[in-house]
């Protein structure tokens, strides 16, 4: 039995959970999330806790136990507090700005790159070089942050590019000249 899966998920106030079979819907102050869980688990609710249990001791059920518990816990966390990812743009002339809901990134190309957010995701820019991606869905926030980083990944020689805040870029030495 999964150690992660054994832990009950506590429901904060203002969070409402409904499930039919393997389909779960979580509503909260930050939005509403819906997901269909894989086969092999069952959900039960007791007062302010949700329990995820494997339906049998087969390998697939045991594999999905911890995963499903984490997915549901992330949904509850997302609709109550939300998730954020912060990115930094490093380099001369590289900057970002928000036009409407679209993020426009100037990252050294001949044209600015536009990133349109999916529903529920918002972009915020501070100081033209710090981008903040927020939303209730952890997976979607991470995917959008990865798309923005992929526009110009950091290079190892000068460290220029788009990186996550706090990400360590391993630097390389440049060419060594003749001695």
Swiss-Prot record:
The domain of life is Bacteria
Keywords linked to the UniProt accession:
Ribonucleoprotein, Ribosomal protein, RNA-binding, rRNA-binding
Look up the coiled coil feature and give its residue ranges.
none
Query: What Gene Ontology molecular-function terms does this entry list?
Result: rRNA binding; structural constituent of ribosome
Keyword NAD appears in the UniProt entry: no
For this record, an example GO cellular component is: cytosolic large ribosomal subunit
Q: Which Pfam families match?
A: Ribosomal_L6
Name any Gene Ontology BP term. cytoplasmic translation
The question of whether Ribonucleoprotein is a record keyword is answered with: yes
Q: Show the PANTHER family listed in the entry.
A: 60S/50S RIBOSOMAL PROTEIN L6/L9, LARGE RIBOSOMAL SUBUNIT PROTEIN UL6M
* NCBIfam families listed in its UniProt record: L6_bact (TIGR03654)
Q: Which family does it belong to?
A: Belongs to the universal ribosomal protein uL6 family.
Instruction: State whether it acts alone or in a complex, and with which partners, per the record.
Output: Part of the 50S ribosomal subunit.
What is the stated purpose of this protein? This protein binds to the 23S rRNA, and is important in its secondary structure. It is located near the subunit interface in the base of the L7/L12 stalk, and near the tRNA binding site of the peptidyltransferase center.
What is the designated name of this protein?
Answer: Large ribosomal subunit protein uL6
The protein's organism comes out as Prochlorococcus marinus (strain NATL1A)
């Amino acid at each position: 039995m999964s150690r992660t899966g054994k832990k009950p998920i506590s429901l904060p106030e203002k969070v409402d959970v409904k499930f039919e079979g393997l389909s779960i819907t979580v509503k909260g102050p930050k939005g509403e999330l819906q997901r269909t869980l894989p086969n092999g688990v069952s959900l039960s609710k007791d007062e302010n806790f949700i329990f995820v249990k494997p339906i049998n001791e087969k390998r697939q059920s045991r594999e999905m136990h911890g995963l499903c518990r984490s997915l549901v816990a992330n949904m509850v966390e997302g609709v109550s507090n939300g998730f954020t990812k912060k990115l930094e743009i490093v380099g001369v002339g590289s900057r970002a700005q928000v036009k409407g809901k679209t993020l426009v990134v100037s990252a050294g190309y001949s044209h600015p790159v536009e990133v349109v957010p999916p529903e529920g995701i918002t972009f915020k820019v501070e100081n033209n070089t710090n981008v903040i991606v927020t939303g209730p869905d952890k997976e979607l926030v991470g995917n959008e942050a990865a798309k923005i980083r992929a526009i110009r990944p950091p290079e190892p020689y000068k460290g220029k590019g788009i990186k996550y805040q706090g990400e360590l870029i391993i630097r390389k030495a440049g060419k060594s000249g003749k001695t």
